[in-house]
């Protein structure tokens, strides 16, 4: 184990337009090759598309989508006595939010559609309506944890 001091958690800066930490976290997930301006443009465009399609506040839809996509439990590999067990663990709030954002962006990339903003908007709308690949991934994670509930006493 490292003897150095633990690294400090970086504070997340709010985004310039919506003053939201979630939007800046989503932008960080969209970001490629340091092109933050382009990432912000994609996210803001996606939020505008959500606003037009649903006629609700896009930030509320984003928050609802992340809440729906956040897993409660996940499995982690733990090696005990020569065999590896998938041990179900509770997911902390920050990690859950990050997993939800990661899944939303990953499935937005794999979607077919015109632009990344359009695909991202559709994925967020689907997640807020509890449908789509992101929700399927969360359910799959929960099923894995449920199937390996017998190994829960190996928690660390």
Curated annotation (Swiss-Prot):
Coiled-coil stretches are: none
Q: Which InterPro entries match?
A: Ribosomal_uS7 (IPR000235), Ribosomal_uS7_bac/org-type (IPR005717), Ribosomal_uS7_CS (IPR020606), Ribosomal_uS7_dom (IPR023798), Ribosomal_uS7_dom_sf (IPR036823)
Q: Which domain of life is it from?
A: Eukaryota
Listed under subunit, the entry gives: Part of the 30S ribosomal subunit.
SS bond list: none
**Gene3D superfamilies tied to this protein:** Ribosomal protein S7 domain
Which HAMAP family does its entry note? Ribosomal_uS7_B (MF_00480_B)
State the family named in the UniProt similarity comment for this chain: Belongs to the universal ribosomal protein uS7 family.
**Do you know which SUPFAM superfamilies this protein is assigned to?**
Ribosomal protein S7
Q: Say where the protein is mainly found.
A: plastid
Query: What is this protein for, i.e. what is its function?
Result: One of the primary rRNA binding proteins, it binds directly to 16S rRNA where it nucleates assembly of the head domain of the 30S subunit.
Q: Which Pfam families match?
A: Ribosomal_S7 (PF00177)
List keywords of the entry alphabetically.
Chloroplast, Plastid, Ribonucleoprotein, Ribosomal protein, RNA-binding, rRNA-binding
Q: A single GO BP annotation from the record?
A: translation
Q: Name one GO molecular function term.
A: rRNA binding
Provide the protein name. Answer: Small ribosomal subunit protein uS7c
One cellular component term (GO) for this entry is: chloroplast
